[in-house]
Design a protein with these regions (language model features):
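Conserved AdoMet/S-adenosylmethionine-binding subsite of the radical SAM
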Residues: 7-23, 32-178
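Short, internal active-site loops enriched in acidic
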Residues: 31-32, 62, 192-197
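Iron-sulfur (Fe-S) cluster-binding segments and ferredoxin-like electron-carrier domains
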Residues: 1-2
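C-terminal accessory regions of radical SAM enzymes
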Residues: 168-201
Length: 201
């Protein structure tokens, strides 16, 4: 919630009071909709919490607007003591172009760990060869494939649904096409569960 420092302070107070919290996740909406100075304020305050070790940022914005990865943003991540992980949301190899690759190179240069999560979508990427090309292009860009999600059964998205049996067939074929470290974990998020449910890894 960009600009809402009162809410942020409540979250900071909670994190500071719970020493078991080692990682903070910036997630959606999209955290990179916030301005660099807003992110800087929040990260500087997180740095002051001694038990925090890692910052994870989930975002799709660099795929749509690669120019969002500004020099100021990269400097902010370079200077933080927190180990920073960025998880991009890319579903098809055609989403990766040279402008996006350059933005990721800037993040690599400041030691940001880059991961990707995709959603398996009927008619978009429900083909092992497409997923292999996606993994190859991600890795060439410095991004490690992390998760391949089975689509949540939500209203209005049924035309993208793939059966679990089909998904497993696609996944097994993908495993035969590329190196193990380029095969993302096949998973589903189930409401009420604290962690993703893994179908294969």
């Amino acid at each position: 919630n960009p600009g809402n420092k009162k809410s942020w302070q409540l979250a900071l107070d909670y994190i500071a009071a719970h020493s078991e919290i080692e990682e903070v996740i910036f997630s959606g909406g999209d955290p990179l909709m916030a301005k660099d100075h807003e992110l800087a304020w929040l990260i500087k305050h997180l740095e002051n919490i001694p038990h925090l070790q890692r910052l994870r940022i989930h975002t799709r914005l660099p795929v749509v607007i690669p120019q969002r990865i500004t020099d100021e943003f990269c400097t902010l991540l370079a200077e933080t003591r927190l180990q920073t992980v960025m998880v991009t949301h890319i579903n098809h190899p055609n989403e990766i172009d040279q402008i996006f690759a350059h933005a990721m190179q800037k993040l690599n240069a400041v030691n940001v760990t880059l991961l990707n999560q995709s959603v398996l979508l009927k008619g978009v990427n429900d083909d092992a060869q497409i997923l292999k090309i996606l993994s190859d292009k991600l890795f060439q860009t410095g991004i490690l494939p992390y998760y391949l999600h089975l689509l949540d059964k939500v209203q209005g998205a049924s035309h993208f649904l793939i059966s679990d049996i089909e998904a497993m067939q696609i996944y097994k074929t993908l495993q035969s096409l590329t190196s193990g470290y380029l095969v993302p974990k096949l998973a589903r998020e189930i409401a009420g569960e604290p962690n993703k449910t893994l179908y294969a890894e």
